[in-house]
Amino acid sequence: MKELNEEVSRKLELIRAALTETGATGVRLKGTDWFAWATAGASNTVLLTAETGVAEVLVTIRDAWVLTDEIEAQRLEDEELSADFKLHVNPWADAAARESFVRDVTNEGKVLSDVCDKAKRLRPIPHVEKRLPASLQHHKRVMMSSELERYREVGRKASVAMTEVLSKAQPTWTEYQLAGAGAEALWARGLHPALTLVAGERRLPLYRHATATGEAIGQQAMLVFCARGYGLYANLTRFVSFGSLGDERAELHRHVREIEAQALNLCKPGTSLDAVYHALAQAYEQHGFPNAIREHHQGGTTGYLAREIVANPTTIDTLSEGIPVAWNPSLPGAKVEDTFVILQDGTLENLTFDPNWPSVEVEGRLRPVPLELT
């Protein structure tokens, strides 16, 4: 018999507090991110590139449902959902039946919905569905202890997959082959390869967001993962060099590690994201690269999205205990990125650290260096 989930029960309390706060009669959560959050890591994903899934959560003051169709219902009930949710099933060809059900159980009142968020392409029903309050959005960004345990698992698996793939890579591989090997290693560990960026030797200095091509990687390559498990994203970047990296390239990597350290040093409860951005801008300038901050975003908070909030000069959102972050400072041909979480004592835990990957200490933290294969 299915059991109730303590984490889900707590989240239903938070959702119902949002109902009380706003005077709404229901909350609909359709995005892959919000569905995973509300269900303690369940997935409504079928199409990996979709921002909304094949099921949604509906919560009223009294009840909590998962709404889906006849195609998905049995699998979701058997494999994904706890006993906290009732299941409402509509015919796959009759989407109007679901909307009628929602109107009935919410007494045709105001409904809050995550599809008002900028990340979602679906639009809410005009004059009925409203944006989720900031209080609930904040709760989604702060990890509970049970979420953090799942996050550690995702981060560990993603980092081990990265090490495995780059350790066996060959300079004759195409960028497609390296991206495919990365995706395979993630799938083998039960993680979605939400993003696998690859740049080989020629393209590395040219593009920050290097989507893979059929070109051979040559003497060095960058591999980037945004790996999703339980709805949580582990974000990391690593480099491999076939033979010695060389002094000039090694110096670029040193610069980005030291620039990143300024961001990590500020990741404490109460720090605003714009303060971190400005610290990074200053660090780039001090290292002799004043325009580099304009060439790529620098990262921000992460969690149920690869980036929940991207830091910019005016981002006033503040960090707190339990918020995960992923910064990604870069220069032409060099970048550093891992996923961290702010702990109760204000320190950072690296969720994507692999002790088998080469590293150096930077301001008290072990940070990755390119893997040199001979």
Specify the residue positions occupied by each region the protein language model found.
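Active-site neighborhoods and metal-handling regions in enzymes and metal-associated proteins
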Residues: 1-374
